[in-house]
């Protein structure tokens, strides 16, 4: 936990004065992201990204990610260097975790109030417009909460509604299990994180009637890839 807090402080809080020159710009997070990756590498954790050829920066859309730990911030930082126009969607409560919430706001993070359905829908409708107008990609964790299970949690449907409303693409991105984190013994070991960017899934022509089928399709695809990547990453783990 100390490592996570220290890393978050160094990569988000220290650069806040720089973010003020152009607030809410996603690329504000680029330099902190590089620092985050270098910092965690000191602890023996390496990141490998596959499937960069599937990225089309001209396409706005929804990027689906599995959610495991607070150090997902490093994974998001690494993906920013590939996608460049990607912003995470997170629960509003994180905004009030000062000063991290302010830093997150300044790098363009989108906050939603999950307890207020109407408010959350309004925010996502606004972002759906940005997807089309600004070619923005929203990084969404469809499981809704982080966990360290071997089975992904049932996907919530909000991200799929956003993609269909904007008639944009969905791009699944799967992150291997963090075998190097021992939650029971609270130990942080050495290991490798494998991130796989899958081909885009178009939603053009889809309607609300297709949400359930699309959700199930993405859940099955991501679970299959998660199992395979996690098994491969396990051989690099040294706790």
What do the PLM-derived regions correspond to, one by one?
Residues 37, 47-54, 79:
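Membrane-helix interface/capping segments
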Residues 11-29, 42-43, 56-117:
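Catalytic core of membrane glycerolipid acyltransferases/transacylases, capturing the structured
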Residues 33-45:
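A generic, lipid-embedded transmembrane alpha helix
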Residues 49, 63, 88-89, 195-197:
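Generic preference for hydrophobic
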Residues 37, 78-81, 102, 122, ...:
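Short amphipathic alpha-helical coupling elements at transmembrane boundaries
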Residues 1-20, 26, 30, 53-56, ...:
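Membrane-interfacial terminal anchoring regions of lipid-handling membrane enzymes
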Residues 121-239:
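Non-catalytic C-terminal accessory region of glycerolipid acyltransferases
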């Amino acid at each position: 936990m100390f490592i996570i807090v220290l890393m978050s402080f160094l990569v988000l809080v220290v650069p806040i004065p720089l973010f003020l020159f152009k607030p809410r710009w996603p690329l504000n997070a680029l330099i902190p992201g590089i620092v985050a990756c270098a910092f965690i590498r000191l602890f023996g954790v390496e990141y490998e990204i596959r499937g960069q050829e599937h990225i089309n920066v001209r396409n706005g859309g929804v990027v689906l990610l599995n959610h495991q730990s607070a150090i997902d911030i490093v994974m998001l930082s690494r993906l920013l260097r590939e996608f460049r126009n990607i912003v995470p969607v997170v629960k509003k409560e994180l905004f009030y975790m000062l000063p991290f919430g302010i830093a997150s706001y300044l790098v363009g993070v989108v906050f939603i109030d999950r307890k207020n359905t109407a408010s959350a829908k309004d925010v996502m409708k606004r972002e759906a417009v940005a997807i089309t107008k600004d070619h923005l990609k929203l990084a969404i964790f469809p499981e809704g909460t982080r966990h360290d299970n071997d089975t992904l949690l049932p996907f919530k449907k909000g991200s799929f509604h956003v993609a269909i409303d904007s008639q944009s693409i969905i791009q699944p991105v799967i992150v291997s299990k963090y075998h190097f984190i021992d939650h029971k013994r609270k130990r942080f070991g050495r290991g490798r994180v494998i991130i796989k960017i899958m081909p885009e899934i178009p939603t053009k022509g889809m309607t609300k009637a297709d949400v359930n089928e699309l959700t199930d399709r993405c859940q099955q695809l991501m679970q299959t890839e998660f199992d395979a990547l996690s098994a491969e990453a396990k051989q690099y783990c040294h706790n």
